[in-house]
Amino acid sequence: MADSVMMGSGSLNSGSRSGSSKTCTSPTENYQLARRRTLQVVVSALLTECGFDSAEKAVVETLTEMMQSYITEVGRCAKANCEHTARSTPTLSDVVITLVEMGFNVDTLPVYAKRSQRMVITAPPITNAPVVPKSLTAGQKRTHPAHIPSHFPDFPDPHTYIRTPTFREPVSDYQVVREKAASQRRDVERALTRFMAKTGETQSLFKDDISAFPLIAAKPSPIPYLSALLPSELELQSLEETDSSEQDDQMDNDNNTSHIMQDDSGADKENEVLPPGGVVPSGKANEENMIDNPYLRPVKKPKVRRKK
Protein backbone atom coordinates (compact mmCIF):
# COMPACT_ATOMS: atom_id res chain seq x y z
CA MET A 1 0.00 0.00 0.00
CA ALA A 2 2.78 2.37 0.90
CA ASP A 3 4.57 1.61 -2.36
CA SER A 4 1.46 2.35 -4.41
CA VAL A 5 0.94 5.57 -2.51
CA MET A 6 4.48 6.68 -3.10
CA MET A 7 4.17 5.82 -6.77
CA GLY A 8 0.92 7.72 -7.08
CA SER A 9 2.27 10.77 -5.35
CA GLY A 10 5.46 10.54 -7.37
CA SER A 11 3.56 10.39 -10.65
CA LEU A 12 1.38 13.31 -9.60
CA ASN A 13 4.36 15.42 -8.63
CA SER A 14 6.55 14.53 -11.60
CA GLY A 15 5.46 17.62 -13.50
CA SER A 16 6.07 19.96 -10.59
CA ARG A 17 9.49 18.48 -9.87
CA SER A 18 10.60 18.83 -13.45
CA GLY A 19 9.39 22.43 -13.54
CA SER A 20 11.27 23.35 -10.37
CA SER A 21 14.52 21.57 -11.14
CA LYS A 22 16.37 24.87 -11.27
CA THR A 23 18.00 25.91 -8.03
CA CYS A 24 16.90 29.24 -6.56
CA THR A 25 19.48 31.36 -4.88
CA SER A 26 17.02 33.54 -2.98
CA PRO A 27 16.08 32.21 0.50
CA THR A 28 12.60 33.67 0.16
CA GLU A 29 11.93 31.75 -3.05
CA ASN A 30 13.28 28.53 -1.51
CA TYR A 31 10.97 28.98 1.48
CA GLN A 32 7.90 29.54 -0.71
CA LEU A 33 8.71 26.63 -3.02
CA ALA A 34 9.11 24.26 -0.05
CA ARG A 35 5.65 25.21 1.24
CA ARG A 36 4.20 24.84 -2.24
CA ARG A 37 5.66 21.33 -2.65
CA THR A 38 4.17 20.29 0.68
CA LEU A 39 0.71 21.37 -0.46
CA GLN A 40 1.17 19.48 -3.73
CA VAL A 41 2.05 16.30 -1.82
CA VAL A 42 -1.10 16.71 0.31
CA VAL A 43 -3.26 17.18 -2.80
CA SER A 44 -1.69 14.08 -4.38
CA ALA A 45 -2.43 12.04 -1.25
CA LEU A 46 -6.06 13.19 -1.21
CA LEU A 47 -6.46 12.23 -4.88
CA THR A 48 -4.96 8.81 -4.16
CA GLU A 49 -7.42 8.31 -1.28
CA CYS A 50 -10.28 9.14 -3.63
CA GLY A 51 -9.16 6.39 -6.06
CA PHE A 52 -7.21 8.33 -8.70
CA ASP A 53 -4.05 6.77 -10.10
CA SER A 54 -2.83 9.81 -12.04
CA ALA A 55 -3.74 13.43 -12.65
CA GLU A 56 -2.73 16.18 -15.00
CA LYS A 57 -0.40 18.91 -13.88
CA ALA A 58 -2.99 21.66 -14.42
CA VAL A 59 -5.49 19.85 -12.17
CA VAL A 60 -2.94 19.43 -9.38
CA GLU A 61 -1.96 23.09 -9.64
CA THR A 62 -5.61 24.19 -9.52
CA LEU A 63 -6.38 22.08 -6.44
CA THR A 64 -3.17 23.29 -4.78
CA GLU A 65 -4.14 26.91 -5.42
CA MET A 66 -7.64 26.31 -3.99
CA MET A 67 -6.22 24.70 -0.85
CA GLN A 68 -3.68 27.49 -0.40
CA SER A 69 -6.38 30.15 -0.78
CA TYR A 70 -8.62 28.37 1.74
CA ILE A 71 -5.83 28.08 4.33
CA THR A 72 -4.85 31.71 3.77
CA GLU A 73 -8.42 32.88 4.30
CA VAL A 74 -8.71 30.84 7.51
CA GLY A 75 -5.51 32.40 8.85
CA ARG A 76 -6.57 35.91 7.88
CA CYS A 77 -9.99 35.63 9.55
CA ALA A 78 -8.49 34.03 12.67
CA LYS A 79 -6.01 36.90 12.93
CA ALA A 80 -8.83 39.43 12.55
CA ASN A 81 -10.88 37.76 15.30
CA CYS A 82 -7.82 37.70 17.52
CA GLU A 83 -7.09 41.40 17.05
CA HIS A 84 -10.78 42.21 17.57
CA THR A 85 -10.49 40.83 21.12
CA ALA A 86 -7.30 42.84 21.84
CA ARG A 87 -4.91 39.88 21.45
CA SER A 88 -1.89 39.40 19.21
CA THR A 89 -1.67 35.57 18.91
CA PRO A 90 -4.63 33.53 17.56
CA THR A 91 -5.92 30.63 19.64
CA LEU A 92 -7.98 27.51 18.87
CA SER A 93 -11.22 29.31 19.60
CA ASP A 94 -10.41 31.92 16.94
CA VAL A 95 -9.86 29.17 14.35
CA VAL A 96 -13.12 27.42 15.34
CA ILE A 97 -15.10 30.65 15.01
CA THR A 98 -13.51 31.26 11.62
CA LEU A 99 -14.43 27.78 10.35
CA VAL A 100 -18.01 28.21 11.56
CA GLU A 101 -18.30 31.57 9.81
CA MET A 102 -16.96 30.02 6.60
CA GLY A 103 -19.68 27.32 6.69
CA PHE A 104 -17.53 24.38 7.80
CA ASN A 105 -19.06 21.75 10.11
CA VAL A 106 -16.56 21.48 12.93
CA ASP A 107 -18.19 18.34 14.41
CA THR A 108 -17.18 16.26 11.39
CA LEU A 109 -13.50 17.11 11.77
CA PRO A 110 -12.65 14.43 14.45
CA VAL A 111 -14.42 11.72 12.43
CA TYR A 112 -12.49 12.69 9.30
CA ALA A 113 -9.21 12.67 11.23
CA LYS A 114 -9.85 9.07 12.47
CA ARG A 115 -10.72 7.59 9.07
CA SER A 116 -9.27 4.19 8.19
CA GLN A 117 -7.89 5.10 4.76
CA ARG A 118 -5.87 8.00 6.03
CA MET A 119 -2.43 8.25 4.50
CA VAL A 120 0.58 9.24 6.56
CA ILE A 121 2.81 11.82 4.91
CA THR A 122 6.37 12.26 6.00
CA ALA A 123 7.17 15.55 7.64
CA PRO A 124 8.62 18.12 5.26
CA PRO A 125 12.18 19.29 5.80
CA ILE A 126 12.52 22.15 8.25
CA THR A 127 13.03 25.41 6.42
CA ASN A 128 13.71 28.55 8.35
CA ALA A 129 11.80 31.66 7.44
CA PRO A 130 13.91 34.16 5.48
CA VAL A 131 15.41 36.86 7.62
CA VAL A 132 15.13 40.34 6.19
CA PRO A 133 18.55 42.01 6.48
CA LYS A 134 18.65 45.40 8.12
CA SER A 135 20.60 47.75 5.92
CA LEU A 136 20.53 50.70 8.32
CA THR A 137 21.51 50.06 11.93
CA ALA A 138 22.31 52.86 14.33
CA GLY A 139 22.49 52.63 18.08
CA GLN A 140 20.79 50.07 20.31
CA LYS A 141 17.16 49.09 20.02
CA ARG A 142 14.93 50.23 22.89
CA THR A 143 13.06 47.70 24.99
CA HIS A 144 9.61 48.10 26.50
CA PRO A 145 9.44 49.84 29.88
CA ALA A 146 7.65 48.23 32.81
CA HIS A 147 4.30 49.97 32.14
CA ILE A 148 4.06 48.70 28.51
CA PRO A 149 2.87 45.07 28.02
CA SER A 150 5.14 42.69 26.16
CA HIS A 151 2.58 41.89 23.43
CA PHE A 152 2.69 45.48 22.19
CA PRO A 153 4.76 46.09 19.04
CA ASP A 154 8.42 46.91 19.42
CA PHE A 155 9.84 50.39 19.16
CA PRO A 156 11.02 51.49 15.73
CA ASP A 157 14.60 51.15 14.66
CA PRO A 158 16.88 53.84 16.18
CA HIS A 159 17.69 55.02 12.66
CA THR A 160 14.14 56.40 12.32
CA TYR A 161 14.84 58.98 15.02
CA ILE A 162 17.86 60.42 13.18
CA ARG A 163 17.07 63.63 11.35
CA THR A 164 19.05 65.31 8.61
CA PRO A 165 18.73 69.06 7.99
CA THR A 166 17.46 69.82 4.50
CA PHE A 167 18.71 73.41 4.19
CA ARG A 168 22.08 74.46 2.85
CA GLU A 169 24.44 77.12 4.05
CA PRO A 170 24.46 80.28 1.93
CA VAL A 171 27.29 80.54 -0.56
CA SER A 172 29.78 83.22 0.45
CA ASP A 173 32.32 82.84 -2.35
CA TYR A 174 32.72 86.13 -4.23
CA GLN A 175 33.08 84.56 -7.66
CA VAL A 176 30.04 82.31 -7.24
CA VAL A 177 27.90 85.20 -5.97
CA ARG A 178 28.88 87.43 -8.89
CA GLU A 179 28.21 84.66 -11.42
CA LYS A 180 24.82 83.98 -9.89
CA ALA A 181 23.90 87.68 -9.87
CA ALA A 182 24.99 88.05 -13.50
CA SER A 183 22.95 85.03 -14.60
CA GLN A 184 19.89 86.29 -12.73
CA ARG A 185 20.26 89.73 -14.30
CA ARG A 186 20.62 88.18 -17.74
CA ASP A 187 17.49 86.07 -17.20
CA VAL A 188 15.50 89.09 -16.01
CA GLU A 189 16.56 91.18 -19.01
CA ARG A 190 15.74 88.37 -21.41
CA ALA A 191 12.32 87.79 -19.85
CA LEU A 192 11.55 91.52 -19.91
CA THR A 193 12.60 91.75 -23.56
CA ARG A 194 10.35 88.84 -24.51
CA PHE A 195 7.45 90.34 -22.58
CA MET A 196 7.86 93.71 -24.28
CA ALA A 197 8.12 92.02 -27.68
CA LYS A 198 4.89 90.07 -27.10
CA THR A 199 2.82 92.89 -25.63
CA GLY A 200 4.10 95.93 -27.55
CA GLU A 201 4.84 96.93 -31.09
CA THR A 202 7.71 95.12 -32.77
CA GLN A 203 9.74 95.36 -35.94
CA SER A 204 10.97 92.36 -37.90
CA LEU A 205 14.25 91.95 -39.75
CA PHE A 206 12.74 89.51 -42.24
CA LYS A 207 9.73 90.28 -44.38
CA ASP A 208 8.76 86.64 -44.93
CA ASP A 209 8.61 85.59 -41.28
CA ILE A 210 7.45 88.38 -38.98
CA SER A 211 7.72 86.32 -35.79
CA ALA A 212 11.42 85.53 -36.30
CA PHE A 213 13.83 87.71 -34.32
CA PRO A 214 11.38 90.48 -33.35
CA LEU A 215 12.81 93.86 -32.37
CA ILE A 216 11.17 96.27 -29.95
CA ALA A 217 9.96 99.26 -31.92
CA ALA A 218 11.60 102.54 -30.99
CA LYS A 219 9.09 105.23 -30.02
CA PRO A 220 10.54 108.74 -30.51
CA SER A 221 9.64 111.22 -27.80
CA PRO A 222 7.74 114.36 -28.93
CA ILE A 223 9.80 116.49 -26.51
CA PRO A 224 13.29 114.97 -26.37
CA TYR A 225 14.70 117.49 -23.89
CA LEU A 226 11.94 116.91 -21.31
CA SER A 227 13.71 113.99 -19.63
CA ALA A 228 16.75 116.18 -18.94
CA LEU A 229 14.65 118.86 -17.22
CA LEU A 230 12.55 116.57 -15.03
CA PRO A 231 14.20 115.30 -11.82
CA SER A 232 14.69 111.61 -11.33
CA GLU A 233 12.82 109.50 -8.79
CA LEU A 234 15.77 109.38 -6.42
CA GLU A 235 16.07 113.16 -6.41
CA LEU A 236 12.35 113.54 -5.73
CA GLN A 237 12.54 111.09 -2.88
CA SER A 238 15.53 112.86 -1.32
CA LEU A 239 13.80 116.25 -1.68
CA GLU A 240 10.66 114.94 -0.01
CA GLU A 241 12.67 113.52 2.87
CA THR A 242 14.58 116.77 3.42
CA ASP A 243 11.40 118.89 3.19
CA SER A 244 9.57 116.66 5.63
CA SER A 245 12.49 116.79 8.09
CA GLU A 246 12.65 120.61 7.81
CA GLN A 247 8.90 120.87 8.41
CA ASP A 248 9.20 118.63 11.46
CA ASP A 249 11.99 120.80 12.87
CA GLN A 250 10.02 123.98 12.21
CA MET A 251 6.93 122.59 13.93
CA ASP A 252 9.02 121.54 16.92
CA ASN A 253 10.52 125.03 17.18
CA ASP A 254 7.07 126.65 16.96
CA ASN A 255 5.75 124.39 19.70
CA ASN A 256 8.71 125.17 21.95
CA THR A 257 8.34 128.92 21.48
CA SER A 258 4.60 128.76 22.16
CA HIS A 259 5.23 126.91 25.42
CA ILE A 260 7.85 129.45 26.48
CA MET A 261 5.57 132.38 25.67
CA GLN A 262 2.73 130.83 27.67
CA ASP A 263 4.99 130.37 30.68
CA ASP A 264 6.24 133.96 30.53
CA SER A 265 2.84 135.54 29.87
CA GLY A 266 2.34 136.47 33.54
CA ALA A 267 5.61 138.37 33.73
CA ASP A 268 5.08 140.08 30.34
CA LYS A 269 1.73 141.50 31.43
CA GLU A 270 3.35 143.48 34.24
CA ASN A 271 6.24 144.77 32.15
CA GLU A 272 4.89 145.89 28.81
CA VAL A 273 8.11 147.68 27.87
CA LEU A 274 11.28 145.61 27.59
CA PRO A 275 14.29 146.62 29.65
CA PRO A 276 17.16 148.27 27.80
CA GLY A 277 19.28 145.09 27.94
CA GLY A 278 16.40 142.75 26.99
CA VAL A 279 16.36 140.29 24.12
CA VAL A 280 13.70 140.19 21.42
CA PRO A 281 11.68 136.95 21.64
CA SER A 282 12.34 134.35 18.96
CA GLY A 283 8.71 134.40 17.81
CA LYS A 284 8.94 138.07 16.85
CA ALA A 285 12.29 137.51 15.18
CA ASN A 286 10.78 134.72 13.07
CA GLU A 287 7.86 136.96 12.12
CA GLU A 288 10.25 139.70 10.98
CA ASN A 289 12.28 137.21 8.95
CA MET A 290 9.18 135.87 7.16
CA ILE A 291 8.82 137.05 3.54
CA ASP A 292 5.68 139.00 2.81
CA ASN A 293 5.59 138.13 -0.88
CA PRO A 294 3.78 134.76 -1.19
CA TYR A 295 5.47 134.04 -4.52
CA LEU A 296 8.91 134.17 -2.92
CA ARG A 297 8.12 131.94 0.02
CA PRO A 298 9.45 128.34 -0.03
CA VAL A 299 7.01 125.66 -1.12
CA LYS A 300 5.45 123.69 1.74
CA LYS A 301 4.90 120.09 0.75
CA PRO A 302 2.63 117.72 2.66
CA LYS A 303 4.25 115.52 5.25
CA VAL A 304 5.17 112.09 3.91
CA ARG A 305 4.64 109.18 6.27
CA ARG A 306 7.53 106.81 6.23
CA LYS A 307 6.70 103.13 6.17
CA LYS A 308 8.19 101.23 9.06
Swiss-Prot record:
Keywords: Cytoplasm, Developmental protein, Differentiation, Nucleus, Phosphoprotein, Transcription, Transcription regulation. Pfam families: Bromo_TP, TAF8_C. Signal peptide: none annotated. Residues 8-21 have a biased composition (Low complexity). The keyword Transport does not apply. Its main location: nucleus. Disulfide bonds: none annotated. It comes from the Eukaryota. The modification Phosphoserine is found at residue 26. One of its GO terms (biological process) is transcription initiation at RNA polymerase II promoter. One of its GO terms (cellular component) is transcription factor TFIID complex. Component of the TFIID basal transcription factor complex, composed of TATA-box-binding protein tbp, and a number of TBP-associated factors (TAFs). PANTHER family: TRANSCRIPTION INITIATION FACTOR TFIID SUBUNIT 8. The TFIID basal transcription factor complex plays a major role in the initiation of RNA polymerase II (Pol II)-dependent transcription. TFIID recognizes and binds promoters with or without a TATA box via its subunit tbp, a TATA-box-binding protein, and promotes assembly of the pre-initiation complex (PIC). The TFIID complex consists of tbp and TBP-associated factors (TAFs). Mediates both basal and activator-dependent transcription. This is Transcription initiation factor TFIID subunit 8. It comes from Danio rerio (Zebrafish). The lineage of its organism: Eukaryota, Metazoa, Chordata, Craniata, Vertebrata.
